[in-house]
């Protein structure tokens, strides 16, 4: 799992934006349905743009159809890795078997 802390968050310079990747493409319709079912906080889903945005434990998460994931308000790569494991468990049914 490739994780990079790319740049400081605008609202809190002590936290970063983590750029990650599932390693698989995302079926956006399934993803949006899954996130609605679990009542993801502040969910915004766009099938047309191929992106879902929601809040998870005080972090802003963006999942793209390509499999890219941006997590805002992260302190360390270990924290980002833990969030990614949580995300994979939440949305595994929306991940396609074909790699991106």
Feature roles, as predicted:
Residues 1, 99-100:
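Short, Lys/Arg-enriched, disordered terminal segments
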Residues 1-45:
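Short Lys/Arg-enriched alpha/beta "domain-start" segment
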Residues 9, 39, 44, 53, ...:
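Aromatic-residue detector
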Residues 18, 52, 69:
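A broad, low-specificity signal marking well-ordered, structured residues that form hydrophobic/aromatic
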Residues 42, 46-60, 66:
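A short, structured beta-strand/loop element
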Residues 45, 97-99:
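Flexible, glycine/charged-enriched surface loops at secondary-structure junctions
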Residues 59-95:
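Short, compact, well-ordered microdomains
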């Amino acid at each position: 799992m490739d994780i990079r802390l790319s740049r400081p968050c605008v609202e809190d310079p002590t936290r970063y934006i983590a750029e990650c990747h599932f390693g698989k493409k995302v079926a956006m319709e399934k993803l949006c349905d899954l996130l609605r079912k679990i009542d993801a906080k502040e969910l915004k889903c766009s099938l047309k743009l191929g992106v879902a945005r929601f809040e998870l434990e005080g972090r802003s998460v963006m999942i793209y159809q390509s499999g890219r994931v941006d997590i805002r308000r992260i302190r360390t790569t270990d924290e980002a890795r833990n969030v990614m494991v949580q995300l994979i468990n939440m949305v595994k049914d929306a991940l396609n078997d074909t790699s991106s």
